[in-house]
């Protein structure tokens, strides 16, 4: 549905040249929810704005639904953009128009008959859960409701693609979850292809099928969400994953934790389990095999891309030789082990 090939984007600011994107290629199959994650300034917004040519690439090809956008005339591009809806971090609603009027705007601009406008807007407001807000004004809506109006407006022309530019970053966690569930529901009901950009791995984890990691204008990793979570290939991907699967060391342990081993100490470990290692009784097996005892301090389990993930903080009691052997055995069985220090 979306195929970006060798996209490069260069900005000129006076005598300065800024390369925002460097030879980026990305393929989003029809019906998928695809996430692009990166830190601020990585090139995410520039990338998504290249899809509908709000930013025209310096080099490269933009194919949407089989149509090469970069070769179209202005009138042809305007027509093609009707198949590409877009929502933003800021809702960009017209304060002087009601909810109905905001959603109706793109249809009115397209000279859609009034009866069809009324039918379509009513249908969309029901879809986004705002069937009772036809006559409300944006000033009377919550942030989540405003974003729902923006989603309905983006769907007014019945697009095949929806672009989401940090669409939940201005919302509180509970509202973010509800908007993500709405996007997932729309994707499922309408078969809509969704490309979203975010700096939060939790967004990717909740609804995306695939994810690409962008850094300094380059895609450094891309795969299914389950594969990236199970086997991250880059330090940046690992960092994003740890941001969504994290456990804080309790304060009383932080006060006692030392970087180097000392007499009668035990190592504190951070264990990450993915795939089959989540459900396997690996800690009890290490106790039997290596004569070590594991004191679990805290643990957390979650899902991403249909795959289960777990993280655990534990003390491992035993001789140095036994604990080293147990750690090596866990690593052989696809558990990521990090020695945080000694207590």
Curated annotation (Swiss-Prot):
It is found in: Cell inner membrane. It catalyses: L-methionine(out) + ATP + H2O = L-methionine(in) + ADP + phosphate + H(+); D-methionine(out) + ATP + H2O = D-methionine(in) + ADP + phosphate + H(+). GO terms for molecular function: ABC-type D-methionine transporter activity; ATP binding; ATP hydrolysis activity; ATPase-coupled transmembrane transporter activity; L-methionine transmembrane transporter activity. This is Methionine import ATP-binding protein MetN. Signal peptide: none annotated. Residues 2-241 form the ABC transporter domain. It comes from Escherichia coli (strain K12). It is a peripheral membrane protein. Its EC number is 7.4.2.11. The lineage of its organism: Bacteria, Pseudomonadati, Pseudomonadota, Gammaproteobacteria, Enterobacterales. Contains a regulatory C-terminal extension (C2) with a ferredoxin-like fold. The C2 domains from each MetN subunit in a transporter dimerize to form an eight-stranded beta sheet. ATPase activity is inhibited by intracellular L-methionine. Binding of methionine to the dimerized C-terminal regulatory domain stabilizes an inward-facing, ATPase-inactive conformation of the transporter, and as a consequence, the rate of ATP hydrolysis decreases. ADP is a competitive inhibitor. Belongs to the ABC transporter superfamily. Methionine importer (TC 3.A.1.24) family. Residues 265-343 are annotated as: C2 domain. The keyword Signal does not apply. GO terms for cellular component: ATP-binding cassette (ABC) transporter complex, substrate-binding subunit-containing; Gram-negative-bacterium-type cell wall; membrane; methionine-importing ABC transporter complex. GO terms for biological process: D-methionine transmembrane transport; methionine import across plasma membrane.
């Amino acid at each position: 549905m979306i195929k970006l090939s060798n996209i490069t984007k260069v900005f000129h600011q006076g005598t300065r040249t800024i390369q925002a994107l460097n030879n980026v290629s990305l393929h989003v199959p029809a019906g998928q929810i695809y996430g692009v994650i990166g830190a601020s300034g990585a090139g995410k917004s520039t990338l998504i704005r290249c899809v509908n040519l709000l930013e025209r690439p310096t080099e490269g090809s933009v194919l949407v639904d089989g149509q090469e956008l970069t070769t179209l005339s202005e009138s042809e591009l305007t027509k093609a953009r009707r198949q590409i809806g877009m929502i933003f971090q800021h809702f960009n609603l017209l304060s002087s128009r009601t909810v109905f009027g905001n959603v109706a705007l793109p249809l009115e601009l397209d000279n859609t008959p009034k009866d069809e406008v009324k039918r379509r807007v009513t249908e969309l407001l029901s879809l986004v859960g705002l069937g009772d807000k036809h006559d409300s004004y944006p000033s009377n809506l919550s942030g989540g409701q405003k974003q729902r109006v923006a989603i309905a407006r983006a769907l007014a022309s019945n697009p095949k693609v929806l672009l989401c530019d940090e669409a939940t970053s201005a919302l509180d966690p509970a509202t973010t979850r509800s908007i993500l569930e709405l996007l997932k529901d729309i994707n499922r009901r309408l078969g809509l292809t969704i490309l979203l950009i975010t700096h939060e791995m939790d967004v990717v984890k909740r609804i995306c099928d695939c994810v690409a990691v962008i850094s300094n204008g380059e895609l450094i990793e891309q795969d299914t969400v389950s594969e990236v979570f199970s086997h991250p290939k880059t330090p940046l991907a690992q960092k994003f994953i740890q941001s969504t699967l994290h456990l804080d060391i309790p304060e009383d342990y932080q006060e006692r934790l030392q970087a180097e081993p000392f007499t009668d100490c035990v190592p504190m470990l951070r264990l990450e389990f993915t795939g089959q290692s989540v459900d396997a009784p690996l800690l009890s097996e290490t106790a039997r095999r290596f004569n070590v005892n594991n004191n679990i301090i805290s643990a957390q389990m979650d899902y991403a891309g249909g795959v289960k993930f777990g993280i655990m903080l534990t003390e491992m009691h035993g001789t140095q030789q036994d604990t080293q052997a147990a750690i090596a055995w866990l690593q052989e069985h696809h558990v990521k082990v990090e020695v945080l220090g000694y207590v």
